[in-house]
Each structure stands twice: as structure tokens, then as C-alpha cells.
Amino acid sequence: MTPRYLVISTILASALPLPLLAQTFDGAVTLGYGQTNVSDTDSDVTTLSLDGRFGLDMGNGLRFGLDLATASLDDGEDDMTRSFAGVTGSYGFQNGASLGVYGEQARLDLDGFGDATMKSYGLTAGYEAEGALVTGFYGESDIDDLPSGIDLTDFGASFRYSGFANGLVGLNLQRTTLSADGLEDVDLDVLGVAGSYDLQAGWTLFGGLAGASLDVIDADLTTLGVGVSYDLSQATQANAAVSLELVRSELDVMGLDADATTVRLGLSIPLGGRSASVPLGSVADTVLNPRHSALSSTLFSAF
């Protein structure tokens, strides 16, 4: 059975009636506003974003997840819209191991150039013990209108540790390989590291560093984001957190440089038992909760 049909069968299985168990739902939603200044230009880019991530634990080892994101970028003349939707299904064993499947779709729409859609699907495996979580994935992607005979292969691994008081750290490595008959493979590599630390009285510091490298044209994109969030429930009855993040992105293509500085404001609402101290869509979040393609990870971490 191919990964595509494994994804479909898992999603269909989630709709079937199951015995009444101790089901647990959690999630978070983040509404974001950003201002980006790009070097050597007179215009700023305004970004409005909405991210949501939700999980359902059936209480019998089965867990399902939903990841949604959309953002509109406007420089005063042209608009760009990016969107993402992903579903996951996994089964956790009593020894801490897990196996699962995923299906994702990323879409980019740019004024004057039309749109492009990428669909990804594959398998996941993980192991969790004493605050440490190691996961890996392997899958394939399809992009609209690509010539036949071109294949996109995705694989990667991530590590996250929350075993010490008030802190969380994570590491993410991914590669997407484009291969075609008679041509040399093209690799897009992503490496990220991130963490967060809960301070006193509802304050949390978070930060992430992500780098993407495309070997065929010697292109590198480096993004650094640092921020702080505040839990409004410490001072009000609102179950929400506000955040401020400063992001610096640097692009180097064959020796030509460009950079951009972004200031992001966020309002995050936690659902169930999930924390909203690290806002969804932040650089730290893209490393701590990575997607399953180096292409989509790069698209959503830079701005």
C-alpha cells in the first residue's frame, strides 16, 4: 500500500465510531500582524496571518492532528497569499514508540504570476521517553504543472526535550530532493534550532534559528527570530497570550545579499491543556513543530 492510500485510509478510519474512551482535545490559535522592511526598497510588507493547530487523543493510542495556516502579504502594490493544511494520524505504543501517516497541502498565490500548490504525504515514526521526543518522516510531494518524470522526496528528523523546569529546546533537520531522469539531484536542506523559557508572572522568552540551503545555485536563507509572550490570565480573566517577535532574514544567492527585518505581534488562544506561550507561526514554532517538507518549512518560516 502506497503512502498516499495509507493517509486516505487513516483519515477515513477517524470518522468511524469508536468505544467511549478518555478522549482529550487540545489546540491553539494565533492571530498575527507583521511589518517587514526589505533592504534597498522603499516599501514595507504588511502581513496578516491566522494559524491553528489541534489534536485529538482517543485514549487508546490513536491520535489525530490538524494544522492550518494562512497569511496575506501586501507591499502596497502586489499581494501574496500563502496557505497550509495538514492532517496527521498516529498510533502510540506503551513503550513510547509511535507510527503514523501525514497528508499536507501548501499553496502560494502571487499577483500577476498565478498560484502553485504542493501536496505532500508520507509516513512518520517517533519515540518519547522522560521528556525527550524523537521523530522522523519519509514521504513524497507533488507540485502542480511540474513536467512528468520529476520527483520530490521529503525526509527529516526532529528532537525536542522538555525534561527540565520551565524550558523547552528543539532541533529540526529536513531535506527535499528533486530528481529527474538524466539530471543531477537538487537538494533543499533545512536546519533549525529553537527553545523557550518560562519566566515568572506569566512571561515567556522564545527564539529560533532556521537555515535553508539550495545547492544547485548556491543559495542560503537564514532566519533568526526572538520574542516574548505574556499570559493575559495572570492579570485578567482572558484565556489568551500576547506576543512580540523580532525576525531577521538574510538571503545570499551566488554572492548577492538581501535582508529583511520583521516585527510581529500575536494574540494566541490555547484550547484544552495546550500552552500558547510560543505563538504559532513564530520562527521558534516552525522548528519545534515542523512540517513535513523543506519547501513548506522554508516558505512559512522566513516572514
Each language-model region and where it sits:
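Residues that define the transmembrane beta-barrel architecture of outer-membrane proteins
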Residues: D44-L50, D79-A85, D115-Y121, G149-F155, ...
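Flexible, glycine-rich linker and terminal segments associated
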Residues: L183, L214-I217, D231-D257, T261-F303
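Gram-negative bacterial Sec-dependent N-terminal signal peptides
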Residues: M1-Q23
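Short glycine/proline- and aromatic-enriched beta-strand/turn motifs that initiate or cap beta-hairpins
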Residues: A22-G76, A125, N166, T262, ...
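Outer-membrane pore/translocation modules
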Residues: M80-T177
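Residues on the lipid-exposed face of transmembrane beta-strands in outer-membrane beta-barrel proteins
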Residues: L50-L56, V87-Y91, L123-Y127, A157-Y161, ...
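Repeated loop/turn-to-beta-strand initiation elements of outer-membrane beta-barrel proteins
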Residues: F25-G27, M58-L66, Q94-V101, G131-G136, ...
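Transmembrane beta-strands of outer-membrane beta-barrel pores
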Residues: L31-S39, L68-D74, G103-D109, T117-K119, ...
